[in-house]
Regions:
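Glycine-/small-residue-enriched transmembrane alpha-helix faces in small-molecule transporters
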Residues: 1-33, 146-182, 189, 215-219, ...
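Loop-to-transmembrane-helix transition segments
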Residues: 3-10, 54-55, 59-85, 102, ...
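Transmembrane alpha-helices of multi-pass small-molecule transport proteins
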Residues: 6-21, 29-81, 131-134, 183-204, ...
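Hydrophobic/aromatic residues within transmembrane alpha-helices
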Residues: 24, 38, 89, 115-121, ...
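Structural motif at transmembrane-helix junctions in multi-pass transporters
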Residues: 30-36, 84-101, 176-182, 226-246, ...
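Alpha-helical transmembrane segments of compact multi-pass small-molecule transporters, enriched
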Residues: 44-49, 101-116, 190-194, 222-226, ...
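Hydrophobic transmembrane alpha-helices of multi-pass small-molecule transport proteins
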Residues: 47-50, 111-114, 124-143, 267-283
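C-terminal transmembrane-helix exit sites in multi-pass transporters
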Residues: 86, 107-127, 137, 249-269
Length: 283
């Protein structure tokens, strides 16, 4: 029952957050400026809310210090990169397409979990990865600049998914090594720190209201929380990464209904079905 509730929490939270960000990008920021600063301020809200995790478990670091520092830095670098790339590209990539492309994190996570977390990779999962790429190619029609080349925003969303795969693996290592609360907070706060540094270096500014920041930050916190709870409850990162890919279908439906993203819908539906079939083979 706890696993079922965790999955339901994830599907709701992980869909609401990107849909709201996509709506903001389309309606509140026509120039798509200040995304680094916006992602930083959103993350500040999320990490402040993460202090509530201390009610569940105290902050206590255990394990090899060098490995913990390395994993924490990887979370900071790749997590902040995933945020910046995703937030910058989201105005130009439809919610459903972004969901399919972002799921590149699944094979990345499975491969890294196999290497570093002693979780298994099977030949059928390799086939699933190939099918996923076919699905991504089908939905990418609008973003192709050549036969096998794509516009920069599609590539940015793809790289965001790759970065997310590294982040998830490093974060899972922290949780398994030093506990759920400590591992999660080390990851989230380091990401926030790196985003703050990027914002200072680039002198980035945005025009979103405090209300936009608080709502986006709260939804982002719930999305992040739903993921770490799900991984913690189920216990197998590869399995969770595969099952949660059903979010692709939810995002296409929600994007069409709530955001009016119905252009070339039959092709997108076919591409999403192919992608889901590939992702199912990754479980």
């Amino acid at each position: 029952m706890s696993s079922l509730i965790s999955y339901l929490f994830y599907f709701v939270a992980a869909s609401a957050s990107p849909l709201y960000r996509r709506w903001l990008a389309k309606n509140k920021n026509t120039e798509n400026s200040g995304q680094i600063a916006f992602s930083f301020h959103v993350t500040v809200v999320a990490v402040l809310l993460s202090l509530g995790l201390l009610l569940y478990q105290p902050f206590h670091i255990v394990g090899n210090t060098s490995l913990l520092i390395l994993a924490t830095l990887m979370c900071g670098i790749f997590g902040s990169l995933a945020y910046v790339l995703s937030y910058t590209a989201q105005k130009h990539v439809e919610a459903g397409v972004a969901s399919v492309v972002g799921n590149i994190y699944t094979p990345i996570t499975i491969i890294l979990a196999t290497i570093f977390l002693s979780e298994k990779l099977s030949p059928i999962q390799i086939l699933g990865t190939v099918i996923l790429f076919i699905g991504m190619f089908i939905v990418s029609k609008k973003h192709r600049t050549g036969k096998f080349t794509f516009d920069k925003y599609f590539v940015m969303m793809l790289l965001s998914g790759v970065s997310l795969g590294v982040l998830i693996t490093a974060e899972r290592f922290l949780q398994k090594t030093t506990g759920f609360t400590t591992g999660t907070m080390l990851s989230w706060w380091t990401i926030c720190l790196f985003l703050g540094i990027f914002t200072l270096i680039t002198h980035n500014k945005h025009t979103y209201s405090k209300k936009d920041i608080v709502i986006t930050g709260t939804l982002r916190f719930l999305q992040n929380l739903s993921w770490v709870i799900l991984v913690y409850v189920v216990g197998n990162l590869s399995y969770v990464s595969a099952v949660t890919t059903f979010k692709v279908v939810i995002m296409f439906i929600a994007g069409a209904v709530l955001l009016g993203e119905r252009e070339d819908l039959p092709r997108k539906i076919i591409g999403s079905i192919v992608a889901v079939l590939g992702l199912l083979l990754l479980k």
